[in-house]
Amino acid sequence: MAQSVQERTRLKNKRYESGVIPYAKMGYWNPNYVVKDSDMLALFRVTPQPGVDPIEAAAAVAGESSTATWTVVWTDLLTACDVYRAKAYRVDPVPTAPDQYFVYIAYDIDLFEEGSIANLTASIIGNVFGFKAVKALRLEDMRIPFSYLKTFQGPATGVIVERERLNKFGRPLLGCTVKPKLGLSGKNYGRVVYEGLKGGLDFLKDDENINSQPFMRWRDRYLYVMEGVNRAAAASGEVKGSYLNVTAATMEECYKRAEFAKEVGSVIIMIDLVIGYTAIQTMAIWARENNMILHLHRAGNSTYSRQKNHGINFRVISKWMRMAGVDHIHAGTVVGKLEGDPIIIKGFYNTLLLPKLEVNLPQGLFFEMDWASLRKTLPVASGGIHAGQMHQLLHYLGEDVVLQFGGGTIGHPDGIQAGATANRVALEAMVLARNEGRDYFNEGPQILRDAAKNCGPLQTALDLWKDIAFNYTSTDTSDFVETPTANV
């Protein structure tokens, strides 16, 4: 005699609890969980939907970013499900937002493919950000275990080797993005590069959206740029470079452009964040194998990193990109035109440069993390900065940084070379003051005025941009301390 539906369900329920049950009761919430050194840890900012318990929301995030689906499935019994389930183990209210919670989640290391940013992110940020139980969700920080970090190559070149290749130590490197970013012919583009490097800069660079457009094809740009680099290097006696953007529609085309850049003598190539994690790792491997510095422009990152309650904090992107193997990444200026709270930006720079991270809640660093001897990634500051801010830039960002003055070089009324010279003289005056033990931050304006007495281009720059400041309150600020904008 055929069994009824009710009888079949009763028999199945003897073997396992079926149906839809709360995530917290399925094992995805465990306040007594003891974190292992090998666990992948993630810190999410969770805004539950009205009426959803924060514990259940935390468990839902853990479940949907690991093994769960919307209902219990019997095939769980074919796995080590107790091991593979992510465990939300701590929920703290956000001090500045009563409807938000910091959720700590631990993942077993076996859930992730070795050496793959793509696989790591497919779990951690894959489906869960569209989950209905949460109103908003942001990945604030991660602790990548030592053993997992060892499966990544890290930066292709690193800060120390880059400085040795350039023979430039003890100061920030100086750069400039060619402006206008679109519309120049190859020959005019190369002229901008030559003028900037001859005036004292270390690098010129392509902007994120210069690839191979009708007004300037990539091969022409590379040839004219390298002519400018070589002439400026010969005239100055310094090693110079210009970031050649190899971003393209396919990996085959990226390789073609990178190989040509190497053939014409470039020391550095550039890619955009929008090419994707797998492509970034692939180009980092190529760069290491070919002794090339790899610059990453974070094009597109603010679409998901800027809003405080939803998306991915840039410190997490910084960790992923250091693992992936980029040598440079834009990481904020504090004083420029782009988003940048001083304390939060300091956390980004520490993430890229320190060999080991300590917990620093004001900076947004929630976990200790040893970088497992991966090389440092050099932060890049660009966007609305000029020579008159040099004391602030050195104070907030330190010396391991590339300071890129685009408009602050090319917008100089006496020309590109004069703009470059103004920046170089301002930097060297400030570094000298620092080395002499002076309070260069508070004395900065006077130090610059004194240097300008012997440098007409610097005086012109100070006169032109003296009143320029971008005093907007940052969108992404610390949850634990109040910080004013840097220029106030």
Swiss-Prot record:
Belongs to the RuBisCO large chain family. Type I subfamily. One of its GO terms (cellular component) is chloroplast. Substrate binds at residues 127, 177, 181, 298, 330, 382. PROSITE patterns: RUBISCO_LARGE. The record marks 337 as: Transition state stabilizer. InterPro entries: RuBisCO, RuBisCo_large_chain_AS, RuBisCO_lsu_C, RuBisCO_lsu_C_sf, RuBisCO_lsu_fd_N, RuBisCO_lsu_N_sf, RuBisCO_lsuI. Mg(2+) binds at residues 205, 207-208. The basic functional RuBisCO is composed of a large chain homodimer in a 'head-to-tail' conformation. In form I RuBisCO this homodimer is arranged in a barrel-like tetramer with the small subunits forming a tetrameric 'cap' on each end of the 'barrel'. This is Ribulose bisphosphate carboxylase large chain. The keyword Amino-acid biosynthesis does not apply.
